[in-house]
């Protein structure tokens, strides 16, 4: 409830302002949404069988809208926390450009429409998974895990791991081993990705009172855990090839990219920081982790359509 109360305190200026489409778009976290959409699309394209282009597009649009709804409801609930962090203070709600009621209505409306569209375009199984991912991100991660435990990213990573599974189920109506492995890959990728970010914005999280791992356990422990998760993530990334679910194109891509990821994680894991440190290794790992997922999921599709 603290997030809601703080969000309501921001309305004194914003209540008089009309909603701008750019602010509504910002609520959906477009950069995060782009990765969600891409991994969902890869899950759909890697699935067996043919999907009608219109229904396939509608399913991916539904996933995008669901991700946008999750982002909007997250920002509505965390407006007060965002106002205390330099990185997020310019967002529409803490900056006073949008009132919380509009953000809440927008998020709920977007979520409802995304579920209706998914049900119309694909099947009830994909719709249930999409609803579960929205609820998990908003309720389990945002409202419960994030303000309470440094394991918020570890457990909450499941929310961001749903898209390829939803894309696959939208195309087939059933779950198979490959999308489950892709779910596991994103789940294990999430801690080193976000903890690399948390290391170089640690002061922001500390100021907002968010118990991220570097704030609670310290930098040394966080660095060790980044390396640990990078190693098991690499194993999960490579696993589809020896298990027979992908071919050599994906396999060699996964080996090369995972080796780079682990090397960057080693650089982060073994170092100590000084007061004036610019955190360049951490920033390199964070940036590469995004490219890693884009390229690896692209390789899943390429391997499916053009196997070696």
Curated annotation (Swiss-Prot):
Keywords: Cell inner membrane, Cell membrane, Heme biosynthesis, Membrane, Transferase, Transmembrane, Transmembrane helix. It is an enzyme of class 2 (transferase). Its main location: membrane. It comes from the Bacteria. It catalyses: heme b + (2E,6E)-farnesyl diphosphate + H2O = Fe(II)-heme o + diphosphate. One of its GO terms (biological process) is heme O biosynthetic process. The chain crosses the membrane at residues 32-52, 53-73, 102-122, 125-145, 153-173, 180-200, 226-246, 250-270, 285-305. Its EC number is 2.5.1.141. GO terms for cellular component: plasma membrane. Pathway: Porphyrin-containing compound metabolism; heme O biosynthesis; heme O from protoheme: step 1/1. It is a multi-pass membrane protein. Pfam families: UbiA. GO terms for molecular function: protoheme IX farnesyltransferase activity. It is found in: Cell inner membrane. InterPro entries: Protohaem_IX_farnesylTrfase, UbiA_prenyltransferase, UbiA_prenylTrfase_CS, UbiA_sf. Carbon 2 of the heme B porphyrin ring is defined according to the Fischer nomenclature. Converts heme B (protoheme IX) to heme O by substitution of the vinyl group on carbon 2 of heme B porphyrin ring with a hydroxyethyl farnesyl side group. Belongs to the UbiA prenyltransferase family. Protoheme IX farnesyltransferase subfamily. This is Protoheme IX farnesyltransferase. It comes from Sphingopyxis alaskensis (strain DSM 13593 / LMG 18877 / RB2256) (Sphingomonas alaskensis). The gene is ctaB.
